[in-house]
Curated annotation (Swiss-Prot):
Alphabetized UniProt keyword annotations: 2Fe-2S, Activator, DNA-binding, Iron, Iron-sulfur, Metal-binding, Transcription, Transcription regulation
PANTHER family: REDOX-CYCLING DRUG-SENSING TRANSCRIPTIONAL ACTIVATOR SOXR, REDOX-SENSITIVE TRANSCRIPTIONAL ACTIVATOR SOXR
Domain of life, per lineage: Bacteria
Protein's name in the database: Redox-sensitive transcriptional activator SoxR
Binding locations of [2Fe-2S] cluster: C119, C122, C124, C130
Record field: transmembrane: none
Stretch forming the signal peptide: none
Region (Might be part of a sensor region): 119-130
BP terms from Gene Ontology: regulation of DNA-templated transcription; response to oxidative stress
Pfam families with a match to the protein in the record: MerR, MerR-DNA-bind
UniProt-recorded Gene Ontology molecular function terms: 2 iron, 2 sulfur cluster binding; DNA binding; DNA-binding transcription factor activity; metal ion binding
Organism name: Escherichia coli (strain K12)
Listed Gene3D superfamilies: 1.10.1660.10
């Protein structure tokens, strides 16, 4: 006897998307308010999502995890046709746009880690070796904050 596969629903409720994607329903509404995802309304005016929203939510979660702002995610999604299901090739192109920003952040974090034990050019002059690294607070003339680290970021 042949087993029938369960029918896959074309449209999902917000609760189903939330459960499957691991985000709160309120997050889905927020993403929608920012134009990152779209829903349709049924006859009872309830939101329904196409299944491809699961991929978009997964991309949003990954991008947020690596520190990509929602505005940047929105810009990347903005070039795609509405309701378009993202292919693996398109995901690769999309993620490559964020690679440079991610590399910059990694470089900054490595520099911060490596400088934690040394002077960061903050102008405090409280460490015994600050007069050697920052005599007379010369870095203060360049601006405020941790000048040695901030200069590396720019």
């Amino acid at each position: 006897m042949e087993k029938k596969l369960p029918r896959i629903k074309a449209l999902l409720t917000p609760g189903e998307v939330a459960k499957r994607s691991g985000v709160a329903v309120s997050a889905l509404h927020f993403y929608e308010s920012k134009g990152l995802i779209t829903s349709i309304r049924n006859s009872g005016n309830q939101r329904r999502y196409k299944r491809d929203v699961l991929r978009y939510v997964a991309i949003i979660k990954i991008a947020q995890r690596i520190g990509i702002p929602l505005a940047t995610i929105g810009e990347a999604f903005g070039v795609l046709p509405e309701g378009h299901t993202l292919s693996a090739k398109e995901w690769k192109q999309l993620s490559s746009q964020w690679r440079e920003e991610l590399d910059r952040r990694i470089h900054t974090l490595v520099a911060l880690r490596d400088e934690l034990d040394g002077c960061i050019g903050c102008g405090c002059l409280s460490r015994s070796d600050c007069p050697l690294r920052n005599p007379g607070d010369r870095l203060g003339e360049e601006g405020t904050g941790a000048r040695l680290l901030e200069d590396e970021q720019n």
